[in-house]
């Protein structure tokens, strides 16, 4: 962690000296992040369409592309405004709303209303429960509690935020 914090000072110099290179790397990272994150959810499009969607050079034609466009916009919001995005339930719901804004999905920006399980299916078609999320009725309080706990831990200053952030993500 100490090395990471030391390099943060050098990062500003590197950004200034190599701005064009970093801009290109950020664009590549956005495309790769969008592709990987959407593939996990079973959302696909062609590489050419993906690149154009991420660069906002075309409009989405399919439901998959609508979800990719929403992801692109949320990722852009996070990249451009991360210093101003508090870890609060209302902000998480706002980002969730924006994620689904192209698809017209009514659940965007709302907590789930039905219980669900994450299953996996083997080659023979047998399903097993991979993960069982909280029941729908517990979700709002759990998100509020997680956000409060994170902010309290950061406020105390006892732990480095670089350790708290992945803990928050894992618990989320």
Where are these regions (language model features)?
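FIC/Doc superfamily catalytic core
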Residues: 1-172
């Amino acid at each position: 962690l100490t090395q990471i914090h030391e390099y943060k000072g050098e990062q500003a110099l590197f950004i200034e000296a190599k701005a064009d290179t970093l801009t290109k790397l950020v664009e590549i990272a956005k495309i790769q992040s969008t592709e990987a994150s959407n593939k996990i959810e079973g959302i696909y499009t062609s590489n050419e369409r993906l690149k154009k969607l991420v660069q906002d050079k075309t409009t989405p034609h399919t439901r998959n592309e609508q979800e990719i466009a929403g992801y692109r916009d949320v990722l852009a919001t996070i990249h451009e405004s991360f210093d101003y995005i508090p870890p609060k339930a209302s902000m998480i719901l706002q980002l969730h709303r924006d994620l689904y804004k192209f698809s017209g999905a009514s659940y965007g920006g709302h907590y789930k209303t039905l219980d669900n399980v994450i299953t996996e299916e083997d080659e023979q078609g047998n399903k097993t429960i991979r993960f069982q999320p909280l029941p729908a009725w517990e979700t709002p309080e759990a998100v509020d509690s997680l956000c409060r706990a994170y902010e309290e831990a950061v406020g105390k200053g006892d732990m480095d935020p670089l350790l708290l952030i992945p803990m928050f993500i894992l618990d989320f």
